[in-house]
């Protein structure tokens, strides 16, 4: 496939599957099925929602497009807002805790051999 065009509103919204997640949803916009070597995903996190501390083999870049949140990466804590972005290498623990308004962000990942996600059970 040499290109792919769609609209975010046409992509199914699924519940985030990290153990302990609350009020967090994902839409897979671009994937291997479109011929890409990477994936583009849109996340929506409801007020007070959470994607708890977890790790995975793949790298990711998170770009905040709406709202504010606390982002924990390794042993650092960042307050993120519109237009902030962060790169997180594979095998680095991280979590997102939303504040009091709807949070939206894009997350671009590569395809590692092992795509499993491991919740760590640690606090942010």
Residue positions per predicted region:
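A short hydrophobic beta-strand segment most commonly corresponding to one strand
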Residues: 42, 87, 101-117
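Glycine- and acidic-residue-biased ligand/ion/polar-headgroup-sensing regions
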Residues: 58-60, 64-69
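A short, N-terminal "cap"/entry segment at the start of jelly-roll beta-barrel domains
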Residues: 1-37, 120-124
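Asparagine-centered strand-capping/turn motif at beta-strand->loop junctions
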Residues: 97-99
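Conserved short histidine dyad/triad with adjacent acidic residue
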Residues: 26, 40-56
């Amino acid at each position: 496939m040499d290109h792919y065009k769609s609209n975010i509103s046409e992509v199914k919204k699924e519940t985030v599957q990290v153990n302990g997640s609350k009020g967090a949803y994902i839409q897979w916009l671009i994937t291997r099925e479109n011929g890409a070597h990477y994936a583009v995903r849109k996340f929506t996190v409801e007020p007070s929602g959470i994607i708890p501390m977890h790790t995975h083999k793949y790298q990711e870049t998170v770009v905040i497009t709406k709202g504010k949140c606390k982002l924990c990466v390794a042993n650092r804590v960042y307050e993120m807002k519109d237009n902030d972005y962060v790169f997180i290498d594979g095998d680095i623990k991280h979590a997102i805790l939303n504040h009091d308004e709807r949070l939206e962000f894009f997350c671009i990942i590569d395809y590692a051999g092992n795509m499993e996600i491991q919740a760590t059970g640690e606090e942010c």
